[in-house]
Amino acid sequence: MANIKSAKKRAVQSEKHRLHNASRRSMVRTFVRKVYNAILTQDKKAAQQAFSAMQPIVDRQASKGLIHKNKAARYKSHLITQINKMH
């Protein structure tokens, strides 16, 4: 454990940020999973609605640096391709 006051403060802040980021990361994964599940059930309308809900969440977290912008782009590209393949 840290001995210096500022190091102790940073340790507390780091833990707080870690928990906050874990929550946000989980939220992103949940939204992506909802789109995947809609694709698996072959429900195009539900998949499009889930994608519309997921897209701003993923973009917002990418802009804040929680996930890399290329990863956000990859999520969106892969999912919209899968949705467009549905008939």
Swiss-Prot record:
Annotated GO MF terms: small ribosomal subunit rRNA binding; structural constituent of ribosome
Top-rank taxon, per record: Bacteria
Cystine pairs: none
Cited InterPro entries: Ribosomal_bS20 (IPR002583), Ribosomal_bS20_sf (IPR036510)
GO biological process, one term: translation
Region ranges (Disordered): 1-25
Key words, A-Z: Ribonucleoprotein, Ribosomal protein, RNA-binding, rRNA-binding
Function in brief: Binds directly to 16S ribosomal RNA.
NCBIfam families linked to this entry: S20
Family: Belongs to the bacterial ribosomal protein bS20 family.
Protein name: Small ribosomal subunit protein bS20
